[in-house]
Amino acid sequence: SANLIYDYTAGYPFLVSKLCKLIDERVAGSKNFPEKTDAWTKAGIIEAVKLLLNEKNTLFESLVNKIQDYPQLHEIIYELLFNGKTILYNSLNPSIEAAEMFGFIKNNDGQVIVSNRIFETVLYNLFLAEDIFKS
């Protein structure tokens, strides 16, 4: 369970805490997960991730605001997610520095990657919605 939670959150404290709370308070005791032990399984964690991705919270709102306020940040994340572009990590690049400071990206063996799967999904869905409204 802990490894799977880490796979989704990369240890981001708010996300870890939120997932654990959702598993404990909303997944456990639900129809598909009647007991607490049922909820602390792969299926229960995935259910909590779905709940988290569908809720509005201050962290996700902050992510969206930063993307809207910093066009270069928007461009970097968009290139990573939709064009599969390899972006070399360079801490002297102001856009990369800002993206890392906000926790959006991290350095993975000299390449920029989105910092965790939950952020990746939130941002992907945001850009997908933007593209739909543009067309």
Regions found by a protein language model. Give the residues of each.
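Winged-helix-like regulatory helical subdomains adjacent to P-loop NTPase cores
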Residues: 1-102, 108
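Short, amphipathic alpha-helical interaction segments positioned at domain boundaries
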Residues: 57, 119-134
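Minor-groove-contacting beta-hairpin "wing" of winged helix-turn-helix DNA-binding domains
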Residues: 111-116
